Amino acid sequence: MQASIESTGNLERRLTFTLPQERLETHVGGRLRELARTTRIKGFRPGKVPTKVIEQRFGQQVRAEAMEGLLRETFDSAVREHSLRLAGNPRIDQGESDFDFVATFEVVPDFGDIDVTNLSVVRHTAEVTDADIDQMIENLRLQRRTWNPVERGAQVGDLVALETWSQAGNERLPAEGVETGSSVLGSGVMFDQIEKGLEGLSKGEDKALSIDFPADWRVPQLAGKTVQVHVKAVEVSEPVLPEVNKEFIKSFGVKSGDAEQFRADIRTNLERELKGALMNRLRREVGEQLIAAYAHVEMPPRLVENEARSMLAQQVDQMRRSGRNPGEIPADAHQGFMDAAAKRVLVGLLVGEVARRNELRLESKRVSETLRLIASTYEEPEQVIEMYRNDPQLMSGLRSRVMEEQVIDWIAERAKHTEQSLSFQDAIRV
């Protein structure tokens, strides 16, 4: 194989290589002959289609597919030959001829000796108690509550139907009439100042409130301004919670309506949630320790920039989903995420290095257990499992997640660690 490697930066490499033309032609010829034997074309007997006809119909597609496969195979072979470990995907450009290519990519930095025994990790523990199950049942009752109109002043927990209009300087919103809506006091859906202002209002009463809107508020006319918000309580209703009886229990999928089975199912769900929360805490603990120990190692610039752009895109998407206006995104907006992105990249590369150096292998049993755990949160678990198994992208993401968890556990077991007990509520709190 003709291939040469050169350094174009501390962590950037340029690989120039040539595809073996004979192998390409051999592959194309073999594929065309195979198609000639199996393709049915009107006017020709099966297996008797002339090669020229097959080439006219399929030659361009077959050659493109063969070129793509051989390009990938040749590049991978050159990477192995030069003992390169890529950080991210390469950019491959055409060279001087049809068979010459130039690949530019970044490599994993040299972390030196990775000694995880010097790390200090706090490993949190927690368990689901009967009180946690009681609280969850109370939350489920709140989900199924009905509302009873009352004549008294509004209290936390009440549902208030309201009318509002706002005055921002000389501008009234809406220009005419009022906006209508409703909110449960104490839910945090509205501004805290508005919720506090609604407390004590009875049906038909109104009040003017001075509210400071954040600069990124979804309504441009209000964003970053101090606004007079006029609110009127149209109706005040108190919650009526359902009894925990057989009908209530059956509504949550427990066909027998048995209270003990209901509590057992809730315990299973809470323990699943707790397991994920404790792993996330451990992931953060290990990540922070790795960052502190290896912050001096230079990260691949392009990989960090791509991660920063991905983080920006996620934030913009979250803002839009929550109704906030992200506004016009400057071309360099991702720069504000560069530090966080560098830390993410550092942890990701270190986790990969620990797995490689210690020959850690993906545990298929753990993959199956995790998949069953994910599927158990849906009404049709078997369909979810089948969906994953038939989707290579979903399975790849699942395997990556499980492998990362294996490495995190491996590091935590060998690091200096202390245990800290938490309540269930504290453990799941972000």
UniProtKB/Swiss-Prot annotation:
User: Which domain of life does the UniProt lineage start with?
Assistant: Bacteria
- What GO terms are given for molecular function? peptidyl-prolyl cis-trans isomerase activity; protein folding chaperone; ribosome binding
Q: What is its EC number?
A: 5.2.1.8
**Does the record carry Metal-binding as a key word?**
no
Which is one Gene Ontology cellular component term of this protein? cytoplasm
The record places domain PPIase FKBP-type at: 157-242
Q: What is its main location?
A: cytoplasm
Cite the InterPro entries for this sequence.
Answer: PPIase_dom_sf, Trig_fac, Trigger_fac_C, Trigger_fac_C_sf, Trigger_fac_ribosome-bd_bac, Trigger_fac_ribosome-bd_sf, Trigger_fact/SurA_dom_sf
Its Gene Ontology biological processes?
'de novo' cotranslational protein folding; cell division; chaperone-mediated protein folding; protein transport; protein unfolding
Alphabetically ordered keywords of this record: Cell cycle, Cell division, Chaperone, Cytoplasm, Isomerase, Rotamase
Q: What is the catalytic activity of this protein?
A: [protein]-peptidylproline (omega=180) = [protein]-peptidylproline (omega=0)
The places in or outside the cell where this protein is found are: Cytoplasm
Q: What is the role of the protein in this entry?
A: Involved in protein export. Acts as a chaperone by maintaining the newly synthesized protein in an open conformation. Functions as a peptidyl-prolyl cis-trans isomerase.
**Similarity remark:** Belongs to the FKBP-type PPIase family. Tig subfamily.
What the record says about its domains? Consists of 3 domains; the N-terminus binds the ribosome, the middle domain has PPIase activity, while the C-terminus has intrinsic chaperone activity on its own.
- The name of this protein is Trigger factor
Q: Species name for this entry?
A: Xanthomonas campestris pv. campestris (strain B100)
The organism's lineage is: Bacteria, Pseudomonadati, Pseudomonadota, Gammaproteobacteria, Lysobacterales
